[in-house]
Amino acid sequence: MMRADLSKKPGQVSAMFDEVSSAYDRTNTLLSVGNDQLWRVATTRAVAPVAGERILDLAAGTGTSSAALAASGAHVVAADFSEGMLEVGRRRLAGDDRVEFVHADATDLPFDDDSFDAVTISFGLRNVVEPRKGLDELLRVLKPGGRIVICEFSTPPVPLVRRGYDLYMKAVAPSLVKLVSSNASAYEYLNESIQAWPDQETLSSWLRAAGFASVEHRNLTAGIVALHRGVKPAGRHAAPRPAAS
């Protein structure tokens, strides 16, 4: 079983998501007791997509959130490091030209500078090998004045809620996973990655250090999940990327 830390190997993470791709969405709904759908609605509202905008949905997985964003009439680029997840999304959204699926590394995005009106990532930043480098890349591809929205597991501020959540993830969730997935170790990794992830204020500080302004967050479901928002300063353009050696 992979151990959760901040030095994850990209190939391991990608392979893990390839393995669980077929059951990923229904497993998430089961484990979250349906809250994943509420979190998706909150994220879509925070992004506030507008018809004609170009939006990057990073770590898009099977494209469920991408489809919700595209319903506004925006063009959504659904990028992910797992080809297995992308293939499920391509089949599901076949014929919907508002969503474009792209295989991409979050730390080296294959997109031009200043090319998206909004960028968003849900439950994926903690799986990036270098999450702070991922934030740098999101800033680079975002247009000046554009907005970023991050939905990620976080730290419940109330100790009683935190203890109850920890108990659920350690004692209850593993049994539920066995009902719908043959890869229980992937969801053991999920629990460990949540435990290793920094709290709300730390992620806010990372966003500010990357160059985002007007950074704020609000807790969802008692802080089990947090929604972070920020903007790229209007006068800021991407710095030139280093030439390939």
From Swiss-Prot:
Pathway the protein takes part in: Quinol/quinone metabolism; menaquinone biosynthesis; menaquinol from 1,4-dihydroxy-2-naphthoate: step 2/2
Keywords: Menaquinone biosynthesis, Methyltransferase, S-adenosyl-L-methionine, Transferase
UniProt-listed Enzyme Commission number(s): 2.1.1.163
Enzyme class, broadest EC rank: transferase
Residues bound to S-adenosyl-L-methionine: T62, D80, D105, A106, S122
Reaction it catalyzes: a 2-demethylmenaquinol + S-adenosyl-L-methionine = a menaquinol + S-adenosyl-L-homocysteine + H(+)
UniProt-recorded Gene Ontology molecular function terms: demethylmenaquinone methyltransferase activity
Repeat is among the record's keywords: no
Single Gene Ontology BP annotation: menaquinone biosynthetic process
InterPro entries attached to this UniProt entry: SAM-dependent_MTases_sf, UbiE/COQ5_MeTrFase, UbiE/COQ5_MeTrFase_CS
Protein origin, superkingdom: Bacteria
Function text: Methyltransferase required for the conversion of demethylmenaquinol (DMKH2) to menaquinol (MKH2).
Family: Belongs to the class I-like SAM-binding methyltransferase superfamily. MenG/UbiE family.
Full protein name: Demethylmenaquinone methyltransferase
